[in-house]
Amino acid sequence: MASSTATMLKASPVKSDWVKGQSLLLRQPSSVSAIRSHVAPSALTVRAASAYADELVKTAKTIASPGHGIMAMDESNATCGKRLASIGLENTEANRQAYRTLLVSAPGLGQYISGAILFEETLYQSTTDGKKMVDVLVEQNIVPGIKVDKGLVPLVGSYDESWCQGLDGLASRTAAYYQQGARFAKWRTVVSIPNGPSALAVKEAAWGLARYAAISQDSGLVPIVEPEIMLDGEHGIDRTYDVAEKVWAEVFFYLAQNNVMFEGILLKPSMVTPGAEATDRATPEQVASYTLKLLRNRIPPAVPGIMFLSGGQSELEATLNLNAMNQAPNPWHVSFSYARALQNTCLKTWGGKEENVKAAQDILLARAKANSLAQLGKYTGEGESEEAKEGMFVKGYTY
């Protein structure tokens, strides 16, 4: 418990320095002390760490285990419908159930996948054989997780940007999800570079993530912190890096204010890449260099795992970039939390036909194994199909 409480910081009355136009690194400790000196000690007392503190640390470490990553299968029913439509299937509960059954029941999936993010329908759903999806995952030593945000809505007063809703009622929902078997949670918000990002949008994203993280930990769920920096735009990799630095500085400022235990969280950042419409592309080595520099400058080593999103990269590109980041030791477990970059070829292979289930599962396992090797820094790229090289960027993508 001592190590868990080491990162439990007292809430500070100082507002975000970056929002005020100043560098987070220039904050003067003396000013904080001066403000605190006028406040009664009892007013500064924060609530004790979550009763689940030890379990949170254990869950986070289990997910962030060598050679393992997360399979994101938490698409909303509407987004799942788009995936099904791409192979000529209607968006019905039966079809969604059939596809999700294919994913969770792939034999040996737990060799490479340590966690699976589910949509709420899936958390309470059974497979086509009548077994609970959660139980099937647990049998494969895969930790069930749950998407808890309620999606993006326009952020009034911003540069046509968005904010993520879902804090209302979150405490009761996360408690219920824990009882249903979930042990970690995900909240996705986005930052758009072509539209700014405005200080308002970054602050709103960071504050929402911090409140969600604190509430999730209080319910026993390890929060995945995901401020996705969208690939949309023609900007270069340096612009992405600058924005990412500001976003993560803001996120950790508010995580600390909300007394979030860093040893009991996981991060799901975007890799630092040029905009999808930029003329200059980056090599895996360049992506790794910029991304690792960002992590070293902004992410405390107390965080156990960094599970990258693919963000519309091709299956092959996402794996190559991850492999490049694991060519030298890192203070965190650097891995993956992929959806399309794990499932795209699998979905096409299945095509909604029962006779194709095994072939589709074999494709899924091959893709999961490739990323497992990349997490270990041992991926070679041999034997990849042309489909794995196809980009999946969608402008203005919604999840």
UniProtKB/Swiss-Prot annotation:
Query: Matching SUPFAM superfamilies, A to Z?
Result: Aldolase (SSF51569)
**Where does it localize?**
Plastid, Chloroplast, Plastoglobule; Plastid, Chloroplast stroma
Task: Quote the function comment for this protein.
Answer: Plays a key role in glycolysis and gluconeogenesis.
Q: Name the chain's protein.
A: Fructose-bisphosphate aldolase 1, chloroplastic
Q: What is the lineage of its organism?
A: Eukaryota, Viridiplantae, Streptophyta, Embryophyta, Tracheophyta
Residues bearing PTM N6,N6,N6-trimethyllysine = 395
Keywords, comma-separated and alphabetical:
Chloroplast, Glutathionylation, Glycolysis, Lyase, Methylation, Phosphoprotein, Plastid, Schiff base, Transit peptide
Induction of expression: By sucrose. Induced by drought stress.
